[in-house]
Amino acid sequence: MSILSFLLGEKKKSAAVAKERLQLIIAHERVGGRPPADYLPALQKELVAVISKYVKISNDDIRVSLERQDDLEVLEVKIEIPQA
């Protein structure tokens, strides 16, 4: 790592930022009990914004859901990508 990149910082890729955010959300859910998943609409909106940079999609093309069974939580993301 050069001194300039250390001082100025390196720009993280959007995939790395999204991964960090999802890990924080999941960790928060585990520690804080089981509050309602009120962050799902915001997560869906942000996913649409990121994916729209590469593929033309709308809000209707993505579905985000959180299912809970006993001690297992599953965050499911379904994205319909139009054929080119």
From Swiss-Prot:
Organism superkingdom = Bacteria
* Keywords, in A-Z order: Cell cycle, Cell division
Instruction: Name the cystine pairs.
Output: none
Known InterPro entries for this protein?
Answer: MinE, MinE_sf
Task: Please report a single Pfam family linked to this protein.
Answer: MinE
**Listed GO biological process terms:** cell division; regulation of division septum assembly
Q: Which family does it belong to?
A: Belongs to the MinE family.
HAMAP family for the chain: MinE
| Function of the protein | Prevents the cell division inhibition by proteins MinC and MinD at internal division sites while permitting inhibition at polar sites. This ensures cell division at the proper site by restricting the formation of a division septum at the midpoint of the long axis of the cell.
What's the protein name?
A: Cell division topological specificity factor
